[in-house]
């Protein structure tokens, strides 16, 4: 998965969508199919999930990510671009899970 580094209040934050951040997202109720039904809620969840893997402060206190989004916006930057990156990374992860290369010659035994 790709990483993105952003600067907020002169501090660098490494953003990344990982297996654990996706688990956190899903445990928080996120569903990509529902994104347009709850755009603000899911916008915040995706933003927060990107911080979880590499930023211990946010992992321990997800509400900190919401303060960071406000600051990022006040600095004239566009949080929507970061959320778009998060959605792309989420979809890439899901596509990778679905793209399992099965050896067609392999015999599979079903045991009941």
Labelled PLM ranges:
Residues 1-8, 22-23, 27-37, 57-112:
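Charged interaction scaffolds used for protein-protein
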Residues 13-15:
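Short, isolated positions in well-ordered beta-strands
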Residues 18:
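Residue-level signal for threonine
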Residues 40:
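Acidic/histidine-rich catalytic cores and adjacent linkers
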Residues 43-53, 84, 88:
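Short, hydrophobic/amphipathic alpha-helical patches that form generic packing surfaces
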